[in-house]
Design a protein with these regions (language model features):
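Charged C-terminal transducer/switch regions of large nucleotide-driven machines
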Residues: 109, 116-315
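Helicase C-terminal subdomain and adjacent C-terminal extension
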Residues: 442-499, 628, 661-758, 829-832, ...
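Phosphate/oxyanion-binding active-site loops and adjacent basic polyanion-contact surfaces
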Residues: 40-43, 63, 67, 94, ...
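Helicase-core coupling region on the C-terminal RecA-like lobe
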Residues: 497-579, 647-649, 677-735
Length: 851
């Protein structure tokens, strides 16, 4: 039974949906992931493993979290694993983005884009013709040799990187062990000095116990001393001479072994002896581990590992890296090898001719001539807009190994079921916290008609006895539900737990924080999005401007009601548009035009309004104020949140179309999904232009409040200090961190007090960074992390994976990180403020910031 049939059966007959296809082995997926030039987050990897393990998967992609990137990676991996994949979306821009990413890595022949767009269709015909021409040429020995050389070089690089990873894993475990031992030693030292008032020089003279047997023997002696002393208490001080001699012998032996003065024992008794013994053993173990760790070439190995990582998975220019070159060449050679078979050549030729035709009769005639199995052997990746795909594809069950449905919250059941009919596995990608089916386009049926049709065709025809009302509850009605609604519905037995993509790359921190706090973060500290743009140079920038206009909405005049338009908002929108187009700043736009990421750049601009009347007014009147070229220069877009889902711009203007009389519009304007989309479209800056807000517009006021607090918190020099960051001594977890802070503060005071700033426990990318040094002049920043601290775990590969995930996450966000060699800051178990490591840190800071 097909996956679609099993899905429908589970809904209509109340049966639990179970995956029927064998999961792809984890080892194969792991190997394939290493062979594509993407650096994937934990969440992205999890979503990929789920998609290859289950027949139905839901990937939730909040705004700006790399949904298209994940789909592209999943698509390329499926191809490498020998699978045929279809990517379909309700919106063409979503398909275009995935096509661009895939073709950049695989080459134009790496995927087949099926569409009615004439320009795209002509480009596809040209591609097919080029392949037909290329097929006349034999595969040269040079091409084969290049392929073999690239393959061997990649295998060598991957093997070498794995070897370094294993060594880093071992080093990290030992560094972590030293860190934990040393922290325990520091606690003993602090306790002995502060509670027992033992002087530091006494502690430094204590003999180190170098084995467990010696420690246990001395502890036995101490316990025997306790028993003798207890017995003396019980007998009111009457102790035999033998016991006195024994006590004296035991105490003397312990003191001699520890090199401790007898006066300390007289003051504190056996308890202090036990503490000294345990401390002595811990400091000995720490020193032994430190001596081992000091021999590790950690910096060299990390540098080599990073170099290999940059060769294989560069952060920029992916299409020109070695893995992409190999993917392009292997794709090209694979197609050319198949085209040596005349039947494949004929298939390609037939399909090219078929692209010429649009009439149903001709399409049907030419489709019959095409061997689609061979076509999809040539092009295992197919992409297209939902409504245009069907004429190009045979209506054959489980034609594709994997179907990925993007923007799934906007895909109604009537359109998607024929697509899913062709799938063995399908992956639903979307976000139930953004706009749903009503934003997706045409609703096919009148709701009354749909209810009557359901009663006629389905009631009493299924084991679950689903009425029209219960069908609506289960999200089975075309007019109200999407495929995403269906699989998430808890009344159905197919509920799919989403894998949430949680790294946000789109918006400036101030804007992304609002989206995260308002829509994605819960009381759980681990919930919400990692704001990957939260770098110092971005945190110091204001990205929001509130502008209130005094005009009422036109329809507020009861005697002569007009459209749902606030003319003051519209007028201010045009003023800002004019300033951005001409790059002539005014009081409203001076900040945005001088924003470092936008200064002297071509800025794209969008205007979103909750009221269709207002967005239509702006769209219709904009050409009266601006030329076609001027609007094109800012890639101008205006619409409602429904229009904007899936789109973004450098600068967004939110002009809701509101005044103080609009209290009854709150449910519409402040709807969770609608407001989420409207407020998350801007990459760099948002203008909020509005009439007087009704008292009940709480979400708009929350946005103003959060943005206002952010701006208010900027209490240092304007545009210089990262918002919300600070330096608190109470955030230092240990004496060592206090020492590091001392040294950095000394360096700043001596070298660059007017430029450099120190922060600690800085929240960024879902982590807390130990220290961050920020240069107000150059906007450079450096994260300083303590090796061995809580960033490590003790269990094998998870230990390295977590550490490497942290490093790779910060790398993806653009952080430069310096790891402190914790083990070099101690001498014989004591912090050494004069160690070479201190000077090493200061030299590094000077080279990084001042040279």
């Amino acid at each position: 039974m097909t996956t679609l049939n099993r899905l429908l059966e589970s809904v209509f007959e109340g049966k639990r949906f179970e995956s029927a296809h064998d999961p792809i082995p984890t080892e194969k997926i792991d190997k394939a992931i290493k062979q594509i030039p993407f650096t994937l987050s934990d969440a992205q990897k999890s979503s990929i493993f789920q998609a290859f393990s289950n027949d139905i998967t839901y990937i939730q992609g909040p705004p700006g979290t790399g949904k298209s990137y994940t789909i592209s990676a999943l698509t390329i991996l499926a191809s490498k694993l020998g699978m045929k994949t279809l990517v379909a979306s309700q919106k063409k821009p979503a398909v275009e983005i995935v096509y661009s990413k895939v073709s950049n890595l695989l080459g134009e022949e790496g995927c087949l884009f099926l569409t009615d767009d004439q320009n795209r269709k002509e480009a596809t015909k040209d591609l097919l013709q080029n392949l037909l021409t290329l097929a006349r040429q034999e595969i040269s020995n040079k091409d084969l040799s290049n392929y073999q050389k690239l393959e061997k070089k990649i295998d060598d690089l991957l093997e070498e990187r794995d070897r370094y990873a294993e060594r880093i894993n071992y080093y990290n475990k030992e560094i972590n062990a030293f860190f934990n031992l040393n922290e325990e030693t520091q606690r003993y030292q602090d306790n002995l000095k502060e509670v027992n008032e033992i002087k530091e020089e006494v502690l430094k003279k204590i003999t180190k116990i170098d084995n467990e047997e010696a420690r246990d023997r001395l502890l036995k002696y101490v316990e025997e001393c306790r028993k003798i002393r207890r017995k003396s208490f019980e007998t009111e001080g009457k102790v035999s001479a033998a016991q006195v001699l024994r006590l004296n012998f035991l105490v003397t032996t312990v003191l001699k072994n520890l090199n401790i003065d007898k006066e300390i024992y007289k003051n504190y008794g056996e308890e202090i002896l036990e503490t000294f013994i345990r401390y002595s053993r811990e400091i000995s173990k720490g020193i032994n581990k430190q001596n081992l760790v000091k021999k590790f070439p950690v910096d060299t190995i990390r540098t080599s590992f990073d170099d290999l990582t940059n060769q294989l998975y560069p952060s920029r220019d992916l299409e020109n890296c070695i893995l992409s070159k190999f993917l392009k060449l292997s794709t090209n050679l694979s197609i050319r090898k198949l085209l040596e078979d005349k039947s494949y050549l004929n298939t390609l030729s037939d399909f090219r001719r078929r692209l010429h035709w649009r009439t149903p009769k001709k399409v049907k005639e030419f489709n019959k001539k095409i061997d689609f199995k061979k076509l999809f052997d040539l092009f295992p990746i197919v992409l297209g807009e939902m409504r245009t795909l069907h004429p190009y594809l045979p209506f054959k069950e489980e034609l594709f190994d994997l179907v990925i449905v993007d923007e799934a919250s906007q895909v109604n059941l009537a359109e998607v079921i024929p697509i899913l009919f062709r799938a063995k596995r399908f992956c639903i990608v979307g976000d139930h916290k953004q706009l749903g089916i009503k934003a997706g386009g045409v609703i096919f049926l009148n709701k009354v008609t749909e209810r009557l049709n359901w009663q006629k065709r389905f009631e009493d025809q299924n084991q679950a006895n689903l009425t029209a009302a219960s069908a609506k509850e289960r999200d089975l009605l075309v007019s109200t539900s999407s495929i995403l609604d269906l699989i998430r519905n808890e009344n159905n037995t197919i509920t799919s737990v989403p894998i949430v993509l949680n790294e946000h790359f789109r918006s400036m921190p101030m804007l992304a924080d609002f989206t995260n706090n308002e829509f994605y973060k819960s009381d759980n500290e681990q919930s919400g999005l990692k704001i990957m743009t939260a770098l110092p140079q971005n945190k110091c920038l204001n990205s929001f401007k509130n502008i209130e206009v005094k005009t009422p909405r036109e329809d507020s005049d009861e005697d002569n009601p007009g459209d749902k338009v606030n003319p003051g908002e519209v007028k201010k929108v045009y003023s800002i548009m004019k300033s951005i187009i001409t790059k002539k700043s005014n009081a409203d736009t001076e900040e945005v035009l001088n924003l470092p990421p936008l200064k002297d750049k071509q800025i794209t601009l969008g205007v979103v309004s909750f009221m269709r009347d207002q967005s239509d007014r702006i769209r219709e009147e904009a050409p009266l104020s601006f030329s076609k070229d001027e609007l094109k220069s800012i890639d101008f877009m205006v619409g409602t949140p429904e229009d904007f889902q899936g789109n973004e711009r450098d600068v967004m203007i939110i002009a809701p179309g509101v005044d103080e009389t609009c209290s009854r519009s709150r449910g519409f304007m402040e709807n969770d999904q609608r407001f989420n989309v409207a407020s998350s479209r801007a990459k760099f800056y948002t203008f909020f232009i509005h009439g007087k807000l009704p008292n009940n517009m709480m979400r708009m006021k929350t946005m103003l409040n959060q943005m206002g607090i952010e701006v208010k918190d900027k209490k240092y020099q304007d545009g210089i200090t990262p918002l919300g960051w600070n330096f608190l001594r109470s955030n230092c977890d240990s004496n060592f961190e206090h020492l590091v802070a001392d040294q950095i503060e000394d360096f700043i005071a001596e070298k660059a007090s007017d430029r450099l700033m120190l922060f600690n426990q800085v929240e960024s990318c879902g982590y807390f960074l130990d220290f961050v040094v920020y240069d107000q002049l150059t906007k450079k920043s450096l994260a300083i992390e303590v090796d061995g601290k809580e960033h490590f775990y003790s269990d094998g590969f998870t230990h390295t994976d977590r550490h490497q995930e942290r490093i790779m996450t910060l790398r993806r966000a653009g952080w430069k990180t310096h790891h402190l060699d914790y083990w070099n800051w101690f001498e014989d178990g004591w912090i050494d403020s004069e160690s070479s490591a201190v000077q090493k840190l200061k030299i590094y800071l000077e080279n990084f910031f001042l040279k």
